[in-house]
Amino acid sequence: MNNSKLTSVKILEDLYKRFKATTVNTKMTLQKLTNRSIDLYLMDENYKNTIETHDNLTASGSNL
């Protein structure tokens, strides 16, 4: 992937554990989910609104 950008983000530990458990026997990775989510966010107004209004996360001191 020559056109990729290395970055780091903080992810809620419980969400990450649940994601890993859910995807353990699939080909879905956090990188795939992130890239697809960003693409949908930029291309799909309904998805963007869903993400921007989602407030079902527990605050942990980071920008959720």
Task: Describe the predicted segments one by one.
Residues 17, 40:
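Active-site micro-motifs of SAM-dependent methyltransferase domains
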Residues 43-64:
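Short, positively charged interaction helices/loops
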Residues 1-11, 20-23, 28-31:
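Short Lys/Arg-rich basic patches
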